[in-house]
Amino acid sequence: MRWIYISPHLDDAILSAGGLIYDQARAGTRVETWTLMCGFPPEADPSPFAQVLHFQWGFASAEETVRLRRAEDARAASRVGAQAVHFDDFPDCIYRRGADGEPLYP
């Protein structure tokens, strides 16, 4: 048997169900966390809001932020016995832009 936890954003599955995931993995069940909104942003110029967050978090760029957050998520999943799977299709909300090219979260 295999359990898959769908996580909209990095760390959501572990924060929401980490104890259950741990118990399942410890019982020998294969457990995966699938994070959907963790793709690398296509823009080299993130919104002012994203830039403020990068500064607060101590990261130099959007790419570094996503790379390090993915690594953190994978370590957290590993700690509870799960395997982290990251999808590249959609970036997190702070990197998304509307049809007009403007940031959704300026």
Language model feature labels by segment:
Residues 1-106:
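Active-site beta-strand->loop->alpha-helix modules in alpha/beta enzyme cores, enriched
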